């Protein structure tokens, strides 16, 4: 590749950084995830809905619910405690009423009513059960209200990117117990959120559901809710809630059971290991090409090539099936043509994949983006390490054409100026200026502070290339391709 043919790299081009207004630190949050759906709540289990708030229920890079709040007589309950349980499957919160006023007087003293919220995410939907119990000595009548909204914001919007235009939103009532929120995007994809309540609320609009609850001393009322991707495939009853919670926990238990058991005489160490296993397997997501460890919630709950490969390398000793899933997924998404807007060339391994409206419209380049200099040699290195760990020659044989294509990319496109070093240089100003592990726009600079201009050769990438070629030779020999 002739360096003179490369476009001028404009350092002022957008770098898709997370905006300083997209703050998750001022509010302690709780996260649940299953598959391509995750939820970020505050400690009460609410989704706030305020401008600049990053909480929400997200599905495939779209915030499908931007507000979901529980109110008691139009007041926020007091937080007693909340936690995400050890298996990361279920969130619970204990709440109570504040002092409630009527006519300037305290009509209901604090902590007479206990509210217990239980939530989990499963197959595109958040399930919730709310228990309300009267701990007072007299009958009580209170109003419980759920306030909700969906802005259908693209994840990059939530992160701080601004858009000039949006699609159209609609809301409709469905019988007396469900609401459907719809958004027709500029990409002509309709995204639909359905909220259902059991039993039916006393009043229901397209923005709130209210229950007039009468409780005798010691009496408990249960309300079941379901909100998420509309498919109508699962019953909307309390029985369905418990069945789906068992299914969610069983699936996570079965997946994490693949990991080798690690135990010691130190209880703190054992707890750290158990929590780490739960965190890791929460991120592993089934895809049509195999299971893949997503890079992390909330901003990176999607496949990243480098992150998936390094995760697979680090976990080969406890669960090599993670590496097998990563290899198959990245082989299925390997570039086959030159596409400058994607920074793609034949044999190159994926950097990032996105599914939202902005990616579909190419307002951001990450629908299927290949701007990563290290993922391609790391792919070959992982295949070699996987073979050393497992001896699985069938997988090596199936993926050998992809490994060959990756090795060809290193020689044909990786070394852009023929100096023996593999370097990177984005092909358009819409791509990432820096394409190594440190990929912010100012990550690579000279000793005097000046920003380095491409092509840029990173020292660790040369080691990855060396490792890829050694592993490539090992695999070729195992397949009988002597002299390859």
Which ranges hold each PLM region?
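Active-site-adjacent bridging/hinge elements
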Residues: 279-294, 298-299, 347-359, 433-447
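Proline/serine/threonine-rich low-complexity linkers at boundaries of modular beta-sandwich domains
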Residues: 106-109
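Beta-strand-rich N-terminal accessory domains
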Residues: 1-104, 122, 228, 270-273, ...
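Long, charged, mostly alpha-helical binding arms that flank functional sites
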Residues: 257, 432-434, 440-461
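Active-site-adjacent structural elements in folded domains
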Residues: 112-115, 208, 291-299, 362-366, ...
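Aromatic-rich carbohydrate-recognition surfaces in CAZymes
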Residues: 301-433, 458-462, 466
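Acidic/polar, glycine-enriched structural segments that form the non-catalytic walls/loops
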Residues: 3-15, 114, 122-127, 134-303, ...
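Active-site neighborhood of glycoside hydrolase catalytic domains
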Residues: 460-484
């Amino acid at each position: 590749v002739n360096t003179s043919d490369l476009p001028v790299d404009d350092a002022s081009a957008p770098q898709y950084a997370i905006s300083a207004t997209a703050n998750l630190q001022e509010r302690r949050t709780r996260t649940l995830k299953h598959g391509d759906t995750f939820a970020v709540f505050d400690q009460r289990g609410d989704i706030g809905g305020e401008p600049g708030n990053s909480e929400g229920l997200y599905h495939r890079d779209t915030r499908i619910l931007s507000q979901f709040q529980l109110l008691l007589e139009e007041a926020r309950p007091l937080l007693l405690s909340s936690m995400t349980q050890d298996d990361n499957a279920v969130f619970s919160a204990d709440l109570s009423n504040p002092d409630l006023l009527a006519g300037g007087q305290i009509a209901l003293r604090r902590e007479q009513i206990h509210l217990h919220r239980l939530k989990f995410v499963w197959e595109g939907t958040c399930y919730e059960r709310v228990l309300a119990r009267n701990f007072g000595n007299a009958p009580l009548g209170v109003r419980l209200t759920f306030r909700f909204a969906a802005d259908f914001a693209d994840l990059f919007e939530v992160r701080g990117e601004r858009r000039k235009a949006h699609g159209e939103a609609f809301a409709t009532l469905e019988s007396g117990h469900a609401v459907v929120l719809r958004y027709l995007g500029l990409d002509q994809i309709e995204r639909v959120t359905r909220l259902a309540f059991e039993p039916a609320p006393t009043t229901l609009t397209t923005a709130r559901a209210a229950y007039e609850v009468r409780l005798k001393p010691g009496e408990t009322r249960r309300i079941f809710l379901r909100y998420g991707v509309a498919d109508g495939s699962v019953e909307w009853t309390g029985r369905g809630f418990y069945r789906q919670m068992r299914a969610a926990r069983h699936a996570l238990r079965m997946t994490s059971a693949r990991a080798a058991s690690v135990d010691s005489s130190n209880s703190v160490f054992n707890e750290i290991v158990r929590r780490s296993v739960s965190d890791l397997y929460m991120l592993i997501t089934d895809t049509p090409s195999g299971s893949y460890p997503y890079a992390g919630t909330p901003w990176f709950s999607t496949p990243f090539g480098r992150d998936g490969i390094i995760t697979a390398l680090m976990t080969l000793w406890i669960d090599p099936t993670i590496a097998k899933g990563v290899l198959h997924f990245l082989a299925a998404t390997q570039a086959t043509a030159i596409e400058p807007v994607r920074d793609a060339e034949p044999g190159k391994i994926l950097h990032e994949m996105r599914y939202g409206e902005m990616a579909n419209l190419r307002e951001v380049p990450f629908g299927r983006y290949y701007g990563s200099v290290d993922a391609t040699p790391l792919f070959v290195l992982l295949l070699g390490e996987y073979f050393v760990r497992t001896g699985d020659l069938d997988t090596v044989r199936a993926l050998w054409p992809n490994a060959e294509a990756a090795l060809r990319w290193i020689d044909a496109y990786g070394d852009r100026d023929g100096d023996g070093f593999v370097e990177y240089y984005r092909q358009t100003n819409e791509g990432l200026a820096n394409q190594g592990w440190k990929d912010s726009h100012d990550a690579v600079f000279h000793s005097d502070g000046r920003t380095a201009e491409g092509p840029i050769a990173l020292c660790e990438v040369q080691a990855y290339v060396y490792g890829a070629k050694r592993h490539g030779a090992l695999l070729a020999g195992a397949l009988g391709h002597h002299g390859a």
